[in-house]
């Protein structure tokens, strides 16, 4: 007869009755000397550990419960925890961030608990709790997870998820070099799924493009994290009407009109951009 039909290193007798196994205390995980494991299923609780591994891995008998996939009740299966060097008997490690792949989303220079990408969140997302960039795309798992990107695929690195690039040649399409990619959003600490991070009515990619192409002697900047620069008129290309009222043409309207925020007369026709846009 086959005493171990499920090949889990635990014979049927012990799956039913552990009273004769030296070092085992009866009724550790069940009553009436029953371990609770199934003699014809190798991994009764489906936690990626064979029943025998769960029973014989420690000096004192059970390391984990072969009939309970999550011995410490922290939401992470015993096998997954052991696979990644966590403690299946310590529920507190669910809230830890071992690889420090959270992100300072509110920019207060402190990674608060809500900003961590905890071990439990790593489990839910299928990422490695000991590798801060599971897919190797240069963007931390926690940053990707928070913004709804895929921390298990490097393909989204070069995507422009919020379409906030700038069509500088005005051909109606965003070519690869015109995109403001998710990786560039990470490097600039902008929001990869929100086209205007600072809410100044200038898209992030537009601000980056014109900031990179400002005049050599220009000290002012266009910053996708500065919500005030969209209201400024760097090139002073507003206009005065016949009643002497000045009409400002701020940077956010330059994007709207597709004009150069550093040049008061983008098309060099002798009329200011603001006057042409309003008349």
Regions inferred by a protein language model and the residue ranges of each:
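Extracellular calcium-associated, cysteine-rich motifs in secreted modular proteins
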Residues: 1-279
């Amino acid at each position: 007869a086959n005493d171990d039909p499920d090949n889990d290193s635990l014979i049927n007798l012990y799956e039913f009755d552990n009273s004769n196994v030296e070092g085992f205390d009866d009724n550790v995980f069940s009553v009436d000397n029953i371990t609770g494991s199934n003699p014809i299923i190798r991994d009764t609780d489906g936690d990626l550990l064979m029943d025998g591994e769960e029973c014989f891995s420690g000096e004192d008998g059970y390391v984990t419960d072969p009939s309970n996939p999550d011995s410490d009740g922290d939401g992470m299966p015993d096998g997954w925890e052991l696979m990644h060097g966590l403690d299946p008997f310590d529920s507190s490690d669910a809230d830890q961030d071992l690889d420090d792949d959270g992100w300072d989303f509110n920019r207060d220079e402190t990674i608060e608990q809500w900003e961590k990408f905890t071990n439990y969140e790593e489990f839910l997302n299928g990422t490695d709790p000991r590798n801060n960039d599971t897919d190797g795309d240069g963007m931390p798992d926690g940053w990707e997870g928070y913004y709804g990107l895929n921390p298990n695929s490097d393909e989204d690195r070069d995507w422009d998820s919020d379409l906030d690039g700038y069509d500088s040649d005005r051909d109606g399409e965003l070519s690869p070099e015109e995109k403001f990619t998710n990786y560039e959003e990470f490097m600039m600490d902008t929001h990869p799924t929100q086209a205007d991070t600072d809410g100044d009515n200038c898209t992030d990619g537009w601000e980056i493009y014109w900031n990179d192409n400002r005049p050599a002697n220009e000290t002012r900047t266009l910053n996708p994290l500065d919500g005030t620069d969209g209201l400024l008129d760097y090139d002073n290309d507003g206009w005065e009407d016949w009643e002497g009222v000045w009409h400002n043409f701020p940077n956010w309207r330059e994007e709207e009109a597709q004009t150069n925020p550093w040049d008061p007369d983008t098309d060099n026709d002798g009329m200011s951009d603001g006057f042409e846009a309003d008349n």
